[in-house]
A protein has these predicted regions:
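Metallocofactor- and cofactor-centric catalytic cores in central/energy metabolism, strongly enriched
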Residues: 1-47, 56-66, 183-238
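Glycine-/Pro-rich loop/turn segments that contact NAD(P) or position catalytic residues
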Residues: 30-32, 36-44, 49-104, 111-122
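Active-site-lining helix/loop region of Rossmann-like oxidoreductase modules
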Residues: 78, 82-214, 218
Length: 238
């Protein structure tokens, strides 16, 4: 058993080691732990990059605290470089622009890393499902009815290890009410896929620190995260 550090000890470590940016990649559902480290970052004078779906940057109270402290924050819930959510968003946005009326969709994900193992606990999964679902809903021409959209982790397959597989289906109607559907299978290595975007988010936080910009960085949050304060299309955010 290893004793957990106190808040004062964490703050002292952050200050003594010269940490400028604290990136949060705790397990999904770690709400209390995330709040603990956010408070530590604020008191230690660190910028914060929130890679998980515990809502901090998109929470007005937390956002105000970072603004008052003059510290930048990016969040919430990082989008992978070429992951299921970004591809789902781009396709839904494309169909909207092409006038396709969408009826229903699903995104089912399996993986074998500890992230997927952790999400077998459905009590920890609620914020993740909300984040991923809203990322897709926000780019639709007309929001899907609740029963017509399912987006979220589906199961833990140990032998997949860090490989993540997504099965996606989108159903809609073309000109003349003619039905269409699209099915897609995506296979990626989960950790490096997310790390690519997390690194860019950290770079943006550092630029903001150097320029004395505090509060939520809305542009990188909208481009890099699934649950930002403001949801823009990826083209606009870019």
């Amino acid at each position: 058993y290893q004793r957990e550090p106190t808040k004062e000890e964490v703050i002292k470590t952050l200050r003594d080691t010269g940490v400028e940016i604290l990136a949060n990649s705790l397990p999904v559902g770690s709400e209390k732990a995330t709040h603990f480290y956010v408070e530590c970052a604020l008191e230690a004078g660190c910028a914060f990059v929130n890679n998980i779906p515990v809502f901090i940057a998109s929470d007005p109270e937390w956002a105000k605290k970072f603004e008052n402290a003059g510290l930048p924050i990016i969040g919430d819930d990082i989008k992978a470089q070429a992951g299921a959510t970004i591809i789902h968003r781009v396709l839904v946005d494309l169909f909207k622009k092409r006038g396709v009326k969408l009826d229903r969709t699903y995104q089912l994900n399996t993986g074998g890393n500890t992230d997927f193992l952790n999400m077998l606990n459905h009590h920890r999964l609620a914020s993740k499902k909300e984040s991923k679902t809203e990322a897709v809903q926000s780019v639709t021409a007309q929001r899907f009815a609740k029963e017509n959209i399912h987006v979220g982790p589906s199961d833990y397959v140990p032998w997949q290890k860090d490989n993540k597989v997504c099965f996606m289906r989108i159903e809609g109607r073309l000109f003349g009410d003619v039905p269409m559907n699209l099915e897609l299978r995506l296979s990626v290595e989960d950790s490096p896929n997310s790390a690519a975007v997390a690194i860019d988010a950290i770079r943006c936080a550092k630029l903001a620190l150097d320029r004395g910009i505090g509060g939520v960085l809305h542009e990188p949050s909208s481009y890099y995260c699934k649950h930002p304060t403001y949801q823009f299309s990826d083209d606009k955010a870019y």
